[in-house]
UniProtKB/Swiss-Prot annotation:
This is Thylakoid ADP,ATP carrier protein, chloroplastic. It is found in: Plastid, Chloroplast thylakoid membrane; Plastid, Chloroplast envelope. Residues 1-61 form a transit peptide. GO terms for molecular function: ATP transmembrane transporter activity. The chain crosses the membrane at residues 106-126, 182-207, 219-239, 273-293, 309-329, 362-388. PROSITE patterns: SOLCAR (PS50920). It comes from Arabidopsis thaliana (Mouse-ear cress). ADP binds at residues 187, 330. The lineage of its organism: Eukaryota, Viridiplantae, Streptophyta, Embryophyta, Tracheophyta. Belongs to the mitochondrial carrier (TC 2.A.29) family.
Amino acid sequence: MGEEKSLLQFRSFPSLKTSDFALTEEPSWRLENNVSSNRRRGNKRSGGVFTNFASLSVAIRRDRRESTFNGRNGGGGGAFASVSVVIPKEEDEFAPTSAQLLKNPIALLSIVPKDAALFFAGAFAGAAAKSVTAPLDRIKLLMQTHGVRAGQQSAKKAIGFIEAITLIGKEEGIKGYWKGNLPQVIRIVPYSAVQLFAYETYKKLFRGKDGQLSVLGRLGAGACAGMTSTLITYPLDVLRLRLAVEPGYRTMSQVALNMLREEGVASFYNGLGPSLLSIAPYIAINFCVFDLVKKSLPEKYQQKTQSSLLTAVVAAAIATGTCYPLDTIRRQMQLKGTPYKSVLDAFSGIIAREGVVGLYRGFVPNALKSMPNSSIKLTTFDIVKKLIAASEKEIQRIADDNRKKASPNTIDEQT
């Protein structure tokens, strides 16, 4: 917005003083009462009394008023005073130009809305982490579900880590280790994006009146974020599991059509209950431990990528060890023809069939997968958050420089 001015002239007002006027808002030309506040802004004021003639040239600032007083002797020994107050430009007029953005590349990130940047950061972090650890995930799924897939007649109730690796390589080749990864990536992009974005959102909601986030608040934010992302992407998780462990399927569309034809829409939500029960504490513990451990480090270490990686490994190890049995239960309930009707039914059934160790089938490959997976995801997201914060500071610095250059000279006194 450009500068707007109006001119008011007062004639034949003897001993014109500021006390002669009562306005609804503080006038920019007021003298005695404004001296201290304007000096703090670096402005200078002339005397407090006008005689004979006074003219007022006024333009109002939205955020602050800067005035220029010029006192000159008029005819008959009278004094003439002029007040000029300049309207500032709108904030967007101080925004960096294209040339300034090119000179400061970090500021380019601020072009993307912060919420959108966080959302896409979560998506990228999840996809990268999942693709790297896909072979370990496939091995874990085979170990977790072998007992149910083999059936009651099979004498071999479980397979080991090395046996699962050998079986995949022998029957399916190298590509077999990434079987089911495409639907997993398709799922993990919205899943990770929603999860990490939701966590940041829930943390804001769960802050106390003092603005601080308690341990319970962090746990609650993590649990809600985990359940939110699971609810949104759950059908894709079921498709990924079926494609990874059931023979005969080659594409995700084949699995989906067969499930609709033979089992109905409800089959896409098999095991949703235990999934929510397992993911809520897992994400709550994982994210909470990551935040708290990172926060407890000396400030100089908090900014280092290595610290984020190690912290994420510790958080993932604690969360995995605590919540893994629930993950095994939900996987077995997702399978076609599962004999289990509830979480308690699955819990007792697995123990009766395989013993307590059955609840931890696939724990080793899962730990090997989840630790780098979580490290890559949380570290990538942490780095992007730092970049976003840095870009905001850079944009503000450039805008402040532009504002200073555009600001008019403040009060100059001439006699």
